[in-house]
Design a protein with these regions (language model features):
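C-terminal motif of bacterial Sec signal peptides marking the signal peptidase cleavage site
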Residues: 16-19
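Bacterial signal peptide processing site
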Residues: 21-24
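Extracellular/periplasmic periplasmic-binding protein-like sensory domains
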Residues: 167-171, 270-347, 437-441, 445-450
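Extracytoplasmic "Venus flytrap"
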Residues: 40-61, 65-83, 105-108, 202-209, ...
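Extracellular/periplasmic ligand-binding modules, especially the Venus flytrap/periplasmic-binding
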Residues: 203, 211, 260-265, 311-376
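Solvent-exposed, acidic/polar segments of extracytosolic/periplasmic ligand-binding ectodomains
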Residues: 31-55, 377-453
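Beta-alpha junction/loop-to-helix N-cap segments that form part of ligand/metal-binding clefts
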Residues: 74-83, 92-163, 231-239, 264
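Extracytoplasmic ligand/sensor domains, especially the bilobed periplasmic-binding protein
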Residues: 49, 123-230, 278-304
Length: 453
């Protein structure tokens, strides 16, 4: 069965249906016509491509796979990002004249292997997606020499695996990318909370490892974890037991690793018993409008923070042209869709793919795109993120963090002391001492980088 295809049909539908909604008007038209994004010039543009140079590539099209658990989660973040970027890029002429087509690979949580087999058969590249159980498809991907620029990686088997370039932080790394954020939160913003930290996670093999990692990093930094508990991953009807446990342990700072809707139910229980930690790390997946709606009754006098880990926030649009342009693009191509943290992560992956592919001309190959991306030693996705050196492993680099706080007026930058634009950069992430697994390599499946064509 062919996947859902986003590309020519979307552009055609937009033209028929009065331009895909309102929004940026002339500015949108100019950005699409130029194919420039942020400070990157002409990443999408017309051309005279004539060859079928690689799997998934013809003289007219480039088929790219985007993984998503949408059949299970119903979250459209990666799909919306794919729709908006490909629509904008194709309106500018595509990739040297080739139409960019996003094949949505719905993994439905457990069907990663099946979708990867399909992607190996049909796609040129994987871009701007992710799956909770992504480790189930790594060996298939490497066996067919399929590179990826993911929006998000989850398991240790996949994080940093071969033929993968990811510039975003994830708890599945061998280092703690949130150690700078937590240091600021515990020692600077709320210094009285250091000896009373709680960790609450949704119960799954993945989040169990997350809990162990967070606890090790916090303990090494001098903080004391007084509460560490799991809750059923599907949530529960009554969160009073967890609220009372947090009160009994006098938790002053809570790190919540789970579904943001569940945090809303926990907050209701905390309010009912009259207890509230000084702060809650709601994790970056809560960076969306739905979270603000769920928490609207408690935003005035509660401290909910998230670390965007070097991804420029939406409230920086006046200072960061790439953010302003992204918002305009959504106004034009997906006016009813929310721009979430996962959308921002996906967009930087699409920009990386387009810029790298554009350098290859007519002879578009996987090797050319992958090697072009690896030459980016200060990658910012046109200004969407803090600089990252894609020629080196992410775990070997210093990091940036930037903190957003939920307020009645929306997500706003906290006073976290930025030193590089809208980011605070230069901290060295804590390296775990425990063995939490390693990424899969080409050698593990009997392949070599020299075989990439």
């Amino acid at each position: 069965m062919r996947p859902n295809r986003i590309g020519v049909a979307v552009v055609a539908t937009c033209l028929i249906a009065t331009g895909c909604g309102g929004g940026g008007g002339a500015q949108d038209a100019r950005s699409a016509a130029s194919g420039s994004f942020g400070n990157l010039t002409g990443i999408c543009r017309p051309g005279d491509a004539s060859s079928a140079s690689a799997p998934g590539v013809t003289a007219d099209e480039i088929e790219v796979g985007t993984f998503s658990d949408i059949g299970f989660t119903r979250y459209r973040d990666f799909i919306d990002a794919a729709k908006v970027f490909t629509s904008w890029c194709n309106a500018a002429g595509g990739i040297n004249g080739r139409t960019l087509v996003a094949n949505i690979r719905d993994t439905n949580l457990t069907e990663v292997h099946q979708r990867m087999v399909e992607s190996c058969r049909e796609d040129f590249f994987l871009v701007g997606g992710g799956a909770a159980l992504d480790g189930l498809g790594v060996k298939d991907r490497l066996s067919c020499l399929l590179p990826e620029f993911p929006a998000h990686v989850t398991t240790s088997e996949n994080t940093g695996s071969d033929l993968q370039l990811s510039s975003g932080a994830t708890v599945s790394e061998g280092v703690d990318p949130y150690s700078g954020f937590h240091d600021w939160l515990i020692n600077d913003e709320h210094p009285g909370s250091a000896n009373s930290i709680g960790v609450l996670v949704g119960d799954s093999p993945i989040t169990e490892v997350m809990s162990e990692k967070v606890t090790e990093s916090l303990t090494a930094s001098g903080a004391t974890v007084v509460y560490n508990e799991k809750y059923p991953p599907a949530g529960i009807s009554d969160w009073t037991t967890y609220a009372r446990a947090l009160r009994a342990e006098r938790v002053r700072g809570l790190i919540f690793l789970g579904e943001f809707r569940h945090l809303g139910r926990l907050q209701e229980a905390l309010t009912d018993i009259g207890y509230q930690p000084d702060w809650i790390d709601a994790n970056a997946t809560s960076y969306n409008a739905e979270f603000l709606g769920a928490m609207r009754d408690s935003l005035e006098n509660r401290n909910y923070y998230v670390d965007l880990s070097g991804i420029a926030p939406l409230d920086a649009a006046a200072r960061v042209p790439a953010v302003r342009q992204l918002k305009d693009m959504f106004d034009q191509y997906a006016p009813s869709s929310d721009i979430t943290f996962q959308v921002l992560r996906a967009f930087q992956a699409w920009v990386l793919f387009a810029k790298s592919a554009a350098t290859c001309g007519d002879e578009l190959t996987r090797a050319c795109v992958y090697q072009a991306a690896r030459k980016e030693t200060a990658w910012t996705a046109g200004g969407l993120q803090a600089p990252v050196d894609l020629s080196r492993p992410l775990a070997e680099q210093t990091r940036c963090f930037n903190v957003q706080q939920a307020t009645p007026e929306g997500w706003k930058a906290a006073e976290f002391g930025p030193n590089t634009g809208v980011f605070r950069c230069g901290f060295t992430p804590y390296r775990y001492t425990q063995d939490f697994g390693r990424p899969i390599t080409l050698a593990d499946v009997g392949r070599s980088i020299s075989e990439l064509e």
